[in-house]
């Protein structure tokens, strides 16, 4: 619970209305380099966008790798896309250590848009900025997915 409160406070501070950066989703910056592209966490539409990427997942679906594969896949990766959930669940540090030879992007609505992440081998961070908070709260209370949140804010990407 304390981690969740801390993470929410970090995002409230960094993901502000006035922040500037590239107005695109971080996944739009990624090219398919086959298995040299490693994705940590499953994203909607990922198979279509990066059909040859190696996907590491906590509960792997068919075609995905288990978490233990990170030690083998990440050091050899050309680019690594990490779900922002890895920050809140505490798994981000070892993933970044293993990815030091790759271009690393942290992606997801909960990604804190902080340049401080660049000090930890992150090259880009792509998150979400809430613009219409009342509508967003209503969407979340109804169990809306990220696609339902999209009209109430904007994605933004910071680059190193």
Model-derived features with residue positions:
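Short glycine-/acidic-enriched loop or helix-start segments at secondary-structure transitions
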Residues: 26-27, 48-49, 91-93, 116-117, ...
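C-terminal functional extensions of proteins
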Residues: 105-160
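Conserved mixed alpha/beta catalytic, RNA-binding, or beta-rich assembly cores of soluble enzyme
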Residues: 5-7, 11-15, 36-73, 83, ...
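Short, conserved loop/helix-junction motifs that constitute active-site signature segments
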Residues: 50, 73-75, 96-101
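Rossmann-like adenosine-cofactor binding region
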Residues: 89-95, 104
């Amino acid at each position: 619970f304390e981690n969740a409160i801390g993470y929410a406070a970090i995002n409230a501070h960094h993901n502000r209305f006035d922040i500037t950066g590239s107005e695109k989703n971080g996944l739009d910056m990624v090219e398919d380099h086959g298995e040299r592209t490693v994705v940590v966490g499953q994203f909607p539409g990922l198979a279509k966008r990066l059909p040859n990427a190696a996907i590491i997942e906590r509960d792997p679906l068919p075609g995905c790798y288990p978490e233990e594969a990170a030690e083998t896949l990440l050091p050899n990766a050309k680019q690594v896309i990490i779900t922002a959930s890895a920050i809140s669940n505490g798994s981000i540090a070892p993933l970044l250590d293993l990815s030091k030879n790759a271009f690393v992007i942290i992606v997801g609505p909960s990604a804190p848009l902080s340049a401080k992440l660049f000090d930890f081998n992150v090259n880009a961070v792509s998150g979400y900025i809430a613009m219409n908070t009342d509508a967003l709260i209503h969407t979340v209370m109804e169990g809306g997915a990220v696609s339902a949140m999209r009209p109430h804010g904007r994605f933004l990407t910071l680059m190193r």
